[in-house]
A protein has these predicted regions:
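Short, hydrophobic/aromatic alpha-helical segments in well-folded domains
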Residues: 143-144, 161
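Conserved hydrophobic residue
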Residues: 152-153
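Short, solvent-exposed positions on alpha-helices
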Residues: 156-157
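Polar/charged low-complexity regulatory segments
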Residues: 1-133, 139, 146, 166-248
Length: 248
C-alpha cells in the first residue's frame, strides 16, 4: 500500500463572482445611467450601461495585444481623472453653500423613500471607476436639491451645477462611445503588414511608447496569447447601450 502512487487532487475552480448593485436617489443620476436617446440634430450618448460595455470590450482588446485598445484605455483613464476633478470642484461649492446653515438648525440628509436599486455586472476596472463617479454625482445632486430647498442657492445655480456635473459624465461617456477594436496586434505593426497599414489609415498613428507596449494603463490586463485571426474581434457578446451590462 505504501508503494502505491496517488493521483494529484484536481480542483476545478470556477471564476470568482460577487453580487453588486448601485442605489440611486435622484432622477438626475438615473438619466445618466440610461443615457440620452438621439434626437433631430443631436446625437445620442450612451449611459453607464453602455460605458461599462465599452470598457469590457476595451479590456478584452488590450488582452489581445491591440495597441489601439491600450491607447484608448490611457485616454479613458485620463478622462476619468478629469471628470473626478470636475465633480470634486462642484462638491466643494455645494459644501460651502451648506456651511451657511445656522448652527441652531440641523439638516438631515435627503434620501429618496423609493430609491432605484440597479444590478451591476462589471468586468473592467475603468468601468468601476465610472460607477463611483455616478454614485458621487447622485450624492452631489441630493445635496444640491437640499441646498435649493433650504434657500441656500437659487434655482439658476441649482440647474447650472446639476448640468455641469451631468455634462462632465456625458462627456466621459461620449468619448468612450468612439472606441472601436482595431483587430490588429503589435506583431502586425512589427511586420508592417496589410492589417497594420489598414489600421493606421483608419485609426491614425499611435504614440511610439504605446505601440511598443512600454506605456499602458495602470489597469491594463496581461496580454494573452492570440488565438484568433487578425481582424477578428474578441469573442464576447456585444452590449447594447441601454441594455443590462452583462459580462462573461
Amino acid at each position: 500500500m505504501a508503494n502505491e502512487r496517488t493521483e494529484p487532487l484536481q480542483l476545478n475552480l470556477g471564476s470568482l463572482r460577487s453580487a453588486m448593485s448601485l442605489t440611486l436617489h435622484t432622477h438626475h443620476a438615473s438619466r445618466i445611467w440610461h443615457g440620452r436617446a438621439p434626437t433631430e440634430g443631436r446625437p445620442g450618448i450612451i449611459g453607464l450601461n453602455g460605458f461599462i460595455g465599452a470598457m469590457n470590450k476595451m479590456k478584452r482588446g488590450a488582452e489581445q495585444d491591440d495597441p489601439y485598445s491600450d491607447w484608448w484605455m490611457l485616454r479613458i483613464e485620463d478622462k476619468l481623472a478629469d471628470t473626478k476633478t470636475r465633480l470634486q470642484t462642484l462638491r466643494e461649492q455645494v459644501d460651502q453653500a451648506l456651511a451657511d446653515v445656522p448652527a441652531a438648525l440641523s439638516l438631515g440628509e435627503n434620501m429618496n423613500v423609493q430609491p432605484v436599486k440597479l444590478p451591476l455586472f462589471v468586468n473592467a476596472q475603468l468601468g468601476f471607476m465610472a460607477v463611483y463617479l455616478l454614485a458621487d454625482y447622485d450624492d452631489l445632486a441630493r445635496k444640491l436639491i437640499l441646498a435649493h430647498h433650504t434657500a441656500l442657492i437659487d434655482r439658476s445655480t441649482l440647474e447650472r451645477w446639476l448640468n455641469d456635473g451631468a455634462h462632465a459624465l456625458r462627456s466621459l461617456f461620449s468619448l468612450a462611445q468612439q472606441y472601436r477594436y482595431s483587430g490588429t496586434t503589435r506583431d502586425d505593426f512589427a511586420a508592417k503588414n496589410a492589417a497594420a497599414r489598414a489600421a493606421l489609415e483608419k485609426f491614425g498613428e499611435l504614440p511610439q511608447d504605446v505601440l511598443e507596449g512600454t506605456r499602458r494603463s495602470r489597469f491594463a490586463p496581461p496580454i494573452a496569447r492570440r488565438t484568433t485571426k487578425p481582424g477578428t474581434p474578441p469573442a464576447a457578446p456585444a452590449i447594447e447601450p441601454d441594455a443590462p451590462a452583462h459580462t462573461d
